[in-house]
Amino acid sequence: KKDTEEITPMPLQRTTYIGYSDASDHGYAMAMITLKDDKMTHVVLKEFTELSVEKDFSVYEYAPSVQAQAVLPQRFIKAQSIDVEGISGATASFDRYRQALKRALNSAKTKDGQRKYFDGIFQGRSRADNHGYGIALVEIKDDRIIGVKLKEVDEKGELKDFETYPHEPSKEAHAKLPQWFVESNSPDIDNFTGATHSTDKYKEAVDNALRKALIERSLPDLIDGTYTAVSDVDSKGYSGASVTIENNMIVEVKLKEYDE
């Protein structure tokens, strides 16, 4: 069917723009578009979970979301608009894609005197270490940070429950730092005593969220998402690597070895 035909790889040049939807406890979407003569010629859509993990639609179990990610790019291109027919059962994904696409298109039409950031809620994550990584949902209005929600993901890929978390400084940092970011209107805050590592992760996550909110920004060399590859096979087996990118930065690498 025409709606699901494959598209050739996107040329990453200044005719390419990226936009992000608002984030919620169910994640967010990203849209990457290429324009030629003011027309959309290529659209790539991605969704990320509330843990800032790209959804792998090759194994994703909810069929309407899989269909939406596959079909909607061509619908947007054909209509040359965000106003297209949605996918039954995937309304939330559809709305996120449309908002991300609208913001990408608005970034292509920047003008003097505009604000620095889109209004909305944007999600960023930090680099991972042996103890996990931080996540920030940053709400922006009129170029001001008006709200911040912080999360931490542990080394098992699960959200930390700060109601029962035993390290008191980390609990206090999680509770107090959102207001510090609001008052600073930036990720540049003092470290929280006894929770330096957590503070650093939150600061990086807030910075990455703000970068997603930018109306005008340069195209990164590395596109957000998770990329997987395997080595050649020899008599002892092979290796695999999974690399996660956020805001032009490698934030996580997972390695595996497989026997022959």
Task: Please give the residue ranges for each predicted region.
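Active-site- and interface-proximal helix/loop "cap" or "latch" segments in soluble metabolic
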Residues: 3, 7-14, 18-117, 124-222, ...
